[in-house]
């Protein structure tokens, strides 16, 4: 279950945890088979990050939020799924539970995400096509940042 993710975070023991099987199993099976292992990993790691396969893992969200030591949830929209913008209430629930969020966004998704979520603990990666576009993105984020 250990994977490497270059997320720009400095930690002695940082790792991306995931359970891709969870998209095919019930909540009961997830709680029985995956949660004990995820809990052990959270206890071991200094900076545990969970790779969350968007809408397909939403049924397991409450279990994941119960992992007290889980620091970050990386929301991943699987090909063909709607943008993370469509799941603002779910992302807000993650923040309310004290979890940071890591998103892979397109430039046009930044504004609604920044307006709908607190900037505290919000991390995202976005590709710019030029230096000018990157500068505009930074200015937009600075303008829209809020608690």
Where are these regions (language model features)?
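Active-site loop segments of alpha/beta catalytic cores
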Residues: 1-147
């Amino acid at each position: 279950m250990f994977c490497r993710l270059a997320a720009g975070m400095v930690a002695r023991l940082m790792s991306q945890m995931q359970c891709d099987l969870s998209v095919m199993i019930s909540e009961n099976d997830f709680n029985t088979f995956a949660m004990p292992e995820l809990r052990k990993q959270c206890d071991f790691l200094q900076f545990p990050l969970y790779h969350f396969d968007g809408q397909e893992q939403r049924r397991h969200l409450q279990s994941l939020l119960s992992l007290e030591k889980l620091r970050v949830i990386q929301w991943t929209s699987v090909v063909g799924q709607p943008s993370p913008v469509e799941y603002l209430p779910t992302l807000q629930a993650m923040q309310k539970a004290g979890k940071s969020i890591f998103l892979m966004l397109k430039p046009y998704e930044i504004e609604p995400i920044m307006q709908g979520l607190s900037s505290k603990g919000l991390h995202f990666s976005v590709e710019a096509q030029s230096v000018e576009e990157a500068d505009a993105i930074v200015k937009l984020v600075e303008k829209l940042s809020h608690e």
